[in-house]
Amino acid sequence: MMVVFVLENATEKLRGTLTRWMIEAKPGVFVGSLNALVRDKLWGMIPDHAPKGALMICSCNNEQGFQMKMYGIPTRSIADLDGLQLIKIQQ
């Protein structure tokens, strides 16, 4: 399954761990093909090692073809509109 992580201020430890499984396409942007177990274990490391926030986008069998999870970004949130995930910007 295709997975993309977008991280803000990730620690070197987390970046090193992610590069074992994924390509760092740009600083803080990791792309790879992971199984669900590895994806969930890596996502579980995010709160301790990327305190400013993170976004995960992964392929999913739904209308959009992907799903999103977000952590620690107070100005944005994920809104569900009839099964479609959208990014809501807080003002």
Protein language model regions, located:
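Basic nucleic-acid-binding interfaces
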Residues: 2-91
